[in-house]
Every structure is written in C-alpha cells, then in structure tokens.
C-alpha cells in the first residue's frame, strides 16, 4: 500500500504539479493535497489509480526497510 508521502515524493521526482496528477487519477487537486498530507485516507481504487498514473509517468515504488520511490531506469538493454 503506498503512502501519502510516497505519492508526494513520486510526483516531485516526475516534476508534476498536483493539477497534472489529480486528473490522471480521477481525483480533485484538493483531495490529492489531503492524501499527501495524511489528512484523508484514499480508497483502494483511488490508491490504485494514483499508483498507476505515477508508474506510467516513470517511477517505481519500493518497500524495503521503509517505503520509498525512485525513477525507473529506461532504455537500458543487456549486451
């Protein structure tokens, strides 16, 4: 399960303002702000939509010792 902090970090890594991510996930910018701040707990569907939009944008979520997020490595091919 992704956290509001991960969502905010992923959005920042992509350089996306809230008004770019929110419509991709089908939520309002106000709701996105509240999710990122931990003031609103999104539904499973909303979390899935946010995760899908961010992953499509080029990030991947990690869950090692602590939850995190990083940019995907693109265009690398094995020789």
Model-found features: residue ranges?
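A detector for short, charged/polar N-terminal pre-domain segments
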Residues: 1-2
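Short basic helix-loop element that most often maps to the first helix and adjoining turn
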Residues: 5-20
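A charge-rich, low-complexity, intrinsically flexible signal that marks solvent-exposed coils, linkers
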Residues: 9, 24, 40-42, 63
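DNA major-groove recognition helix of helix-turn-helix/homeodomain DNA-binding modules
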Residues: 26, 45-63
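Recognition helix of helix-turn-helix/homeodomain-like DNA-binding domains
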Residues: 26-42
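Helix-turn-helix/homeodomain-like alpha-helical modules used for DNA recognition
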Residues: 59-79
């Amino acid at each position: 399960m992704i956290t509001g902090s991960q969502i905010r970090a992923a959005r920042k890594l992509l350089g996306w303002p809230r008004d770019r991510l929110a419509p991709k996930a089908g939520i309002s910018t106000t709701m996105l702000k509240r999710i990122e701040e931990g003031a609103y707990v999104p539904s499973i569907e909303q979390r899935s939509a946010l995760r899908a939009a961010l992953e499509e944008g080029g990030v991947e979520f990690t869950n090692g010792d602590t939850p995190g997020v990083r940019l995907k490595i693109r265009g690398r091919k094995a020789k």
